[in-house]
A protein has these predicted regions:
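Residue-level signal for nonpolar/aromatic packing positions in well-ordered secondary structure
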Residues: 22, 33, 42, 68, ...
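C-terminal lobe and pocket-closing loops
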Residues: 207-277, 307-310
């Protein structure tokens, strides 16, 4: 009888262990991740996201594959709407910057509170760019030409933040540059090189290759001081040209659907903290493109994001008036 009881207890323990193992949830993530880029190929968000994916995979920071998907349009809103429509919010993340914050707010795709913050990564510079053989080799050339023929020169913009920059140039210089909205920096570059527009708004990573190749030329930087990023070391700032009010920095980070689980949020916050500590990020991206590295974890980024969004909306209201 004792032997029978002992045997039955052993069987019960074994069966319980099997069911316990089978019922335990596997650690997140258990399937592939889609990294959505709410912009066209070749733009600043595209360059950053693909580098992030490369760093994550090379350093084995995520056990699953990560696939990049470009969904440009609507100043980021098209990609954000695509993310919102996904049935499993834990497996889709997307890049965000100040311009796409404005686009998402205006379209209602990421209104206040309707997102999950993962990490802030850095702060980017903004450039005023033209074709390398353009007759407008300096900002003074451009201003003189537009004042002589108001409305005759166009500036390509990828988003509302770019349009704010153009509006502020017009206010500062008393000019009438015309802004034209495109889906991304890649499209703006094509339009400049094709002679369809004369200028464009770019982040350094978007223009670096074409400036280095001699196709484009940056003639002004929206900053207090010059950048050390190649090939923009000699680009003058609006501040040194007598317009310290023309200073813009673009924050860059990563968000997810508002319904993402806390487990997934913390996983990605940790992943991006590790990414930001790598040489590939610090040197291969930030130093190369003049980006100021600035990591904030998911909770700190949420507090920052809400306040930054309010400031951006105030600037956009100024543009609308």
């Amino acid at each position: 009888m004792k032997k029978t009881l002992v045997f039955m207890l052993m069987v019960l323990v074994a069966v319980t262990a099997v069911f316990a193992q089978g019922g335990a949830e596997a650690a997140y993530p258990t399937q592939g991740i889609e990294f959505v880029i709410p912009a066209s190929a070749g733009g600043g968000s595209d360059i950053m996201a693909r580098l992030l994916i490369d760093i994550i995979q090379k350093n084995n920071l995520c056990p699953q594959t990560i696939t990049a998907t470009n969904k440009g349009g609507g100043s980021g809103a098209t990609g954000q709407a695509y993310v919102n429509a996904k049935s499993n919010p834990d497996y889709t993340i997307f890049t965000i910057n100040d311009a796409h914050t404005l686009g998402g707010n205006a379209a209602g795709t990421i209104p206040e509170g309707n997102f999950t913050t993962l990490a802030m990564l850095g702060v980017d510079e903004v450039l005023f760019v033209t074709k390398a053989d353009s007759p407008y080799q300096t900002m003074d050339d451009a201003v003189a030409a537009i004042k002589a023929n108001p409305g005759s020169l166009s500036v390509g913009c990828a988003d509302q933040l770019d349009r704010i920059c153009v509006a502020d140039i017009n206010e500062a210089y008393g000019t009438k540059f015309t802004d034209i909205l495109f889906n991304g920096a890649g499209d703006i570059a094509t339009a400049i090189l094709g002679g369809h527009i004369q200028f464009g708004m770019f982040n350094p990573n978007e223009a670096a290759a074409l400036v280095a190749s001699g196709d484009l030329k940056a003639i002004a930087l929206f900053s207090e001081q010059r950048t050390s990023a190649h090939p923009f070391e000699d680009v003058p700032t609006f501040t040194e040209m007598g317009h310290p009010e023309l200073v813009y920095k673009m924050t860059r980070g990563v968000l997810a659907n508002a319904k993402m689980s806390r487990e997934a949020q913390l996983f990605w916050s940790d992943v991006f903290e590790k990414v930001c500590a790598t040489d590939e990020w610090q040197v291969g991206y930030c130093q190369k493109y003049g980006v100021t590295p600035m990591y904030l974890n998911c909770d700190d980024y949420e507090a920052f994001y809400v306040e930054n969004e309010k400031s951006l909306i105030e600037k956009l209201a100024k543009l609308s008036n």
